[in-house]
Amino acid sequence: MMDGVFPRDVLIRPVADNDRPTVAWLTTQLWGATEVVVHDDAFHPADLPGFIAERAGRIAGLVTFEVRSGVMEIVTINALNLYQGIGTLLIEAVRAEAKRLGCHEVMLTTTNDNIGALRFYQRRGFRLAALRPGAVDRSRQHKPEIPRTGDFGIPLRDEIDLSCPV
């Protein structure tokens, strides 16, 4: 589903138990804490299943997810270097795992300011599924380190769900 060529030198592998400290560290670096709050739920990505993208023995990306009632929810996804196909490879790994587990849908949540993510996911077959006005404001009560202003100076207030059938 990607325009262009997949990087051939990237290994996608499941998160292993010995990766958990690294996942916790990366989560803190990328998300500001070891905990992520989405749709009023708190998640600890280091405790979740996921996939690591490696290039030349170094981490190039990470995705974590949770499965509930036949829906695989992406909790975090990060490509450490953009526009190199890492995010797409991680999405494809999640889709394959969702299919293997018998899930009928993959979903995720992003924020109203994350224009790049909205473009990325929709180009990969995800559709807008729900809008939660004020959800980030509520999450900030639990996790005050969430900034008030996001990408492009846009006030960070709302959550947007996207979903894709498996």
Which functions belong to the PLM regions below?
Residues 14-84, 88-92, 157, 165:
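Acetyl-CoA-dependent GNAT
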Residues 1-18, 160, 166:
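Conserved N-terminal entry element of GNAT/NAT acetyltransferase domains
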Residues 38-40, 145-153:
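Short, P/G- and charge-enriched loop/turn segments at secondary-structure junctions
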Residues 79, 108-117, 129, 133-140:
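Conserved beta-strand-loop-alpha-helix junction that forms the acyl-donor binding cleft
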Residues 98-110:
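Conserved GNAT acetyl-CoA-binding A-motif
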Residues 121, 126:
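Conserved active-site tyrosine of GNAT-family acetyltransferases
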